[in-house]
A protein has these predicted regions:
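N-terminal small/polar loop signature for handling phosphorylated ligands or for N-terminal nucleophile
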Residues: 164-175, 192
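A glycine- and small/hydrophobic-rich beta-loop-beta segment
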Residues: 258, 265-291
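Conserved small-residue-rich beta-alpha loop and adjacent elements
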Residues: 103-169
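Conserved NAD(P)+-binding/catalytic subdomain of aldehyde/semialdehyde dehydrogenases
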Residues: 175-263
Length: 291
C-alpha cells in the first residue's frame, strides 16, 4: 500500500488521476476481428479462440452435461454464497420495476407509460485472474426481472476448453440457459452479428478489457446497443476510527483484484486505522490463491 499523509493542495490533481483507456491504437485490430466474425461466423470465433485463448474448440455452446458437472464441482459453501448474493441482487432490482399509472388527461383520453423488456440480450463475463461469478449474477438477475425472453452469456474458456464451474452454476441459478465459450472481441462480434451457434442480440451488457471496450463501441455505431464503455475498476472507502479494518481491507481487495489498472483508495483521518488496514490487506493477500 502507498500511504500518503496530509497531501498539499498542489498534489490533489495528481492524486485524482486515474488510468485512462488508450483505444485508438487498438481500433484497427478490433475492426479486423469484428469483420471476420461478421463474415465467417463460428469459424472465425473458433479460430480466434485458438489464437488468443490457446484452446481448440469443436463447438462453442456449453452442453447440459457440462452444466451438470459444474454443479457437482461447486462446493456447498460457495453455492450458499452465490444463492445469498443472488437473493440480495434480486431483492434490490425487483424494487426498481416500473409501476405504470394510467392518467385521464381529458374525458375519454387516458395516457400511461409502459416499460417493455429488451427481447434478446447478450451478457459478457470476462476471464482474467478469477472466475467473476458475481458479474454473472449482476447481469443476469436484472435481465430476468426485466422479463427479457432470451438471455445468452459469452465467457472465455480455459485451455482445456472448459468454463469455470462457478460461472456455469451462477448462470444456471440466475436463469441463463445458454452459455457460449467465446471471449474478447470475437464474443462481442458474435453477439452483435450472430453466427450459426451464437444468436444475434439486441443489446450487449458486461465489462471487459480495452479490446472488449473498443469492440462494444464499434458495434454500437450501427449494429447493436450496448450498456456503456467500462473503464478500470475503482473504489474509494471513506472511513474513521470506528471502521472494521477487516471489512475495509476486503472492500479494497475486491476491486483491486480486477486488474493491474484498478484503483483502490482508503481515505481516513485515523492513523490507527491505516496501520490496521495495511496489516489486514497483507494478511488477506497471504491467504489468497492469487496475488
Amino acid at each position: 500500500m502507498n500511504i500518503i499523509r496530509y497531501p498539499e493542495r498542489l498534489e490533489w490533481n495528481f492524486l485524482l488521476k486515474r488510468s485512462a483507456l488508450q483505444t485508438e491504437s487498438l481500433r484497427e485490430t478490433v475492426c479486423e476481428i469484428l469483420e471476420k466474425v461478421r463474415t465467417q461466423g463460428d469459424r472465425a470465433v473458433i479460430g480466434y479462440e485458438e489464437q488468443f485463448d490457446k484452446v481448440k474448440l469443436n463447438s462453442l455452446e456449453v452442453t447440459e452435461k457440462e452444466f451438470e458437472e459444474a454443479e457437482k464441482e461447486v462446493d456447498i459453501k460457495l453455492k450458499a454464497a452465490i444463492m445469498l448474493a443472488l437473493n440480495n441482487i434480486q431483492t434490490f432490482h425487483s424494487s426498481q420495476k416500473f409501476a405504470s399509472k394510467k392518467i385521464e388527461t381529458l374525458p375519454g383520453v387516458t395516457c400511461w407509460q409502459k416499460a417493455v423488456a429488451i427481447e434478446k440480450v447478450g451478457l459478457y463475463v470476462p476471464g482474467g485472474t478469477a472466475p467473476l461469478f458475481s458479474t454473472v449474477l449482476m447481469l443476469a438477475a436484472p435481465a430476468q426481472i426485466a422479463g427479457c425472453k432470451e438471455i445468452i452469456l459469452c465467457t472465455p474458456p480455459n485451455r482445456e476448453g472448459k468454463i469455470h464451474p462457478a460461472i456455469l452454476y451462477a448462470a444456471r441459478v440466475a436463469g441463463v440457459k445458454r452459455v457460449f465459450k467465446a471471449g474478447g472481441v470475437q464474443a462481442i462480434g458474435a453477439m452483435a452479428y450472430g453466427t450459426s451457434s451464437i444468436p444475434k442480440v439486441y443489446k450487449i451488457f458486461g465489462p471487459g478489457n480495452q479490446y472488449v471496450t473498443v469492440a462494444k463501441q464499434q458495434v454500437a455505431l450501427r449494429d447493436v446497443a450496448i450498456d456503456m464503455p467500462a473503464g478500470p475498476s475503482e473504489v474509494a472507502v471513506l472511513a474513521d476510527e470506528t471502521a472494521n479494518p477487516t471489512f475495509v481491507a476486503s472492500d479494497l481487495l475486491s476491486q483491486a483484484e480486477h486488474g493491474a489498472d484498478s484503483q483502490a483508495i482508503l481515505i481516513t483521518t485515523s492513523e490507527t486505522l491505516i496501520d490496521k488496514v495495511a496489516a489486514e490487506v497483507d494478511r488477506q493477500l497471504s491467504e489468497l490463491p492469487r496475488k
